[in-house]
Amino acid sequence: MGKVYDWFEERLEIQAIADDITSKYVPPHVNIFYCLGGITLTCFLVQVATGFAMTFYYRPTVTEAFASVQYIMTEVNFGWLIRSVHRWSASMMVLMMILHVFRVYLTGGFKKPRELTWVTGVILAVLTVSFGVTGYSSPWDQIGYWAVKIVTGVPEAIPVVGSPLVELSRGSVSVGQSTLTRFYSLHTFVSPLLTAVFMLMHFLMIRKQGISGPL
């Protein structure tokens, strides 16, 4: 094992990377509330893992979506647990995100030179909410259907561009298969990818600038 480690160490300088990570200065005022962002990240990773597991059985069609969710809950080994953890971690992620935003705002973590960190955080907050909106439609039950109909109908109040926006979000004039396909794509691919990118930017900036000092 020593020779294998030395081979990687010679090429990647693993020890230097480890020393940089473990020796980062942590201000003495930091408390448990500064962990809220990390907890949000943990919830996101749980979401990715459980969501990926359910994609093996879920069918994003208006005729099979509800039945496939029922199949996951009743027939798949530990399917009920996987879906329940997915739902619980989704609620926890939203809660932790809100608390994290309040903590950063109240402690002045958005001030110079951390404005861009705050901007990426706000974008991540919007993406977090988008997970809830797009994922709510997945079972395609009565609640999911009418929630999608209401949400996609909101832009109709906007003059001139309202109706085109509604049709764009629904994929047609009315809510149907195109709507479910769009929401499923956003929920399982677009939103997770954007979230991963902005999280990486967010953490790199925190790593570079460090934790903000006390007020």
Curated annotation (Swiss-Prot):
It is found in: Plastid, Chloroplast thylakoid membrane. Its cofactor is heme b; heme c. It comes from the Eukaryota. Pfam families: Cytochrome_B. Heme b 1 binds at H100, H202. Heme c binds at C35. InterPro entries: Cyt_b/b6_N (IPR005797), Cyt_B6_PetB (IPR023530), Cytb/b6-like_sf (IPR027387), Cytochrome_b_N_euk/bac (IPR048259), Di-haem_cyt_TM (IPR016174). The keyword Nucleotidyltransferase does not apply. Its main location: plastid. Binds 2 heme b groups non-covalently with two histidine residues as axial ligands. GO terms for molecular function: electron transporter, transferring electrons within cytochrome b6/f complex of photosystem II activity; metal ion binding; oxidoreductase activity. CDD domains: Cytochrome_b_N. GO terms for biological process: photosynthesis; respiratory electron transport chain. Belongs to the cytochrome b family. PetB subfamily. Component of the cytochrome b6-f complex, which mediates electron transfer between photosystem II (PSII) and photosystem I (PSI), cyclic electron flow around PSI, and state transitions. This is Cytochrome b6. It comes from Huperzia lucidula. The lineage of its organism: Eukaryota, Viridiplantae, Streptophyta, Embryophyta, Tracheophyta.
